[in-house]
């Protein structure tokens, strides 16, 4: 197994800039409208195409620089339930169904799963090769600002299962996300 390198942000395209602990020059990449704006279109194909370009640029960056292309920290699947949360623009809104479906399309575009031998993937199945891995953010209920790195954010079971976890389920089952970034909860 070859060495795998972590990635940078990718919520609305590949973030490939210097000064974040990486020793490479700034690299021009495509920057899309923030996910909250793209989700407002309800256009799943648009989201998939944005993910496709993000995945291609991440892989090209990995091939050229040798860093940060094997995975990207995206999409943000947190629910945008409080307008004071400073990262609402990274999410897809306050509806778990819309968020799950849109984020799954972005993942599918980024990862571009396929089989080494060229055979098609069975619908709903997994390929044996991906372009770049999607890492979901932030599992789960990470949408509070005050003391978010220190306090646990507790929710009722109904909110937990019907609201907060639902988009993550879509992303795991339909999008086949490769990883999950956790939040700070107990």
Identify the residue ranges that each predicted region occupies.
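Glycoside hydrolase catalytic-domain context in secreted enzymes
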Residues: 1-186
